[in-house]
Amino acid sequence: ILKKYIQNNYSLNVNYRQNDNVGRRFTLDGGIQNLQNRLKSSLVDNICYDYDMVNAHPSIVLYIIKNYFKNLPCNYIAQYVNDRKNVLVNNNIDKFDILKSINVSHKLKSDNPWLLSFHQEITNLQNILYEKLKDKFVINSKTNPKGSLLNKVLCVLENHILHTAESHIYEKYNIYPDSLMFDGLHYKINNIIDDLNSCTKIYGINWDIKKHSLKIEIGESPILPQIKYEDSYLGVKEKFEKTYFLLLSPKVLFCRLYNDNDGLKKMMSYYQNI
């Protein structure tokens, strides 16, 4: 990625693809989106702001139920979306427990009463979506089809919300995002939180700037011991090639020998089966 970036005068146009032409947009041929978090943070720190949808998938779940399936119970889902921090602390769970609950349809291996109640509400939504949409999506999972379908629906809506945000910012500021981050965007400007919140309010999505907190600390370059040329790779290679060479076809290694009697250089082949 960095080589391409340098070769293109420190600018890299990135194309995106979608699995089955729906849902999230993934970079083609590399991009900042694919990098490990610490490396990504180190490269974009002080250059781009990482705008992130707060609590994206749970918020979209609540939006779906409130707007399309109003008869489904969603008390626990609403609790989590509206008071995430306290729900996590009070019930001794973390956000990964929530995301797992959303994405699986089998019974949770947990005895946490709050989490089990949350998952029951999710299961109700999974069941009804599966019956309505199972012929509309490609579902590759045989062991978790309902959870897989819900995830696809969430990613489709997530991408629609991302498009909405991109379009709104472009219309107002005439700028495109520097990169797409699934449920977020990179921009060089830092004053657009209110704009993002206003254009995605209908979906119950708020935005925040994610801090680049996992940077790689680069210290001083280590002082390496001086290596004599004859002991370096190039020196050893040069010395080796004065005596040996390899014929690829037929594969034979030749060694140069010296005749003490007449002083003439002669060749000997060996290692016929290397």
Name each model feature, range by range.
Residues 154-171:
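Short amphipathic alpha-helix segments
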Residues 20-146:
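Helical catalytic core of nucleic-acid polymerases
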Residues 50-53, 176-188:
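Catalytic palm active-site di-aspartate
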Residues 5, 11, 71, 236-274:
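Intein modules and their embedded homing endonuclease domains
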Residues 92-95, 99, 149-158, 179-182:
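Short basic/aromatic active-site micro-motif
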Residues 1-42, 246, 256:
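Common nucleic-acid-contacting/processivity interface regions adjacent to the catalytic cores
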Residues 105-115, 143-147, 192-248:
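C-terminal polymerase-core module
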Residues 38-41, 172-179:
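Short, flexible, solvent-exposed loop/turn segments with mixed acidic/basic and small polar residues
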